[in-house]
């Protein structure tokens, strides 16, 4: 089969700081598909990953390249900012077999307010959305539409605006569950996320010195915990009610109960580590999810830790 993989940072070169993480995910997927006998192509604005065939693209032509090349491929998978993913997945699905989420599911996940409401209606624990700050409490502020820890802050006060949402801050372990969603959901691993809090005196709330930027800096895969079953059950329920399909990363803060803080309807950076400890090929699993029946479980051996700095060293130079 011929597989199209589109990763936004690599394909557009718009935000160079995101290229290492994007290239790591792209290379991981491309190498996996190639190892099991498939042909891979990917849009690139200059970054080479050493696997598959690069298709010349730019910030202006990325969408057109996806639409054009999808017609010549048997299947495709896209990684893009949450706000762009629904439309890109629509274009992909109209031209080939989409191995990822439907446009509708991607849109539900992209809207952090709507996503939280869906989860809570389904009885899944998620941090409460807060309209007004109370003295002595901490809150997480993030864009209503955004990716991961992008423009996310821990604050002691905030102004309520339509662009950002505020939620209660939950103390606990910062984890994620990586899984393949579909008719037969397949949990892959629990991952420990390395989250850094950097105090800032400006930014989203310049008059409040108690502002900390929240930064994701890699993960450990797998993370062994006696509550793995509870975490898997929570993640599977979340993707079920959101209607996700394909590779999904569910961010969870594990406190007295698991709290779902974000659902990423696309491959996430954790895939870089998972591919190094999982015996099965992620590419084959994604195709089987679309065209066949997934196994009951996967085999994981050893552990792997990476940081964003490490990805920068590996993929920071074209």
Task: List PLM regions with ranges.
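Nucleotide-activated donor-dependent transferases that construct or modify glycoconjugates
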Residues: 1-18
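Short catalytic helix/loop segments, enriched in acidic residues and glycine
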Residues: 17-33
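Conserved N-proximal alpha/beta basic substrate-recognition cap immediately N-terminal to
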Residues: 42-128
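Peripheral (often C-terminal) accessory segments that flank ATP-dependent C-N-forming ligase machineries
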Residues: 75, 285-318
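ATP-grasp fold ATP-binding core
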Residues: 119, 136-152, 163-172, 177, ...
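ATP-dependent carboxylate/phosphate-activation module, predominantly the ATP-grasp catalytic core
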Residues: 167-243, 254, 264-291
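Flexible, glycine/charged-enriched surface loops at secondary-structure junctions
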Residues: 245-251, 295-299
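Conserved protein kinase catalytic/activation segment
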Residues: 257-259
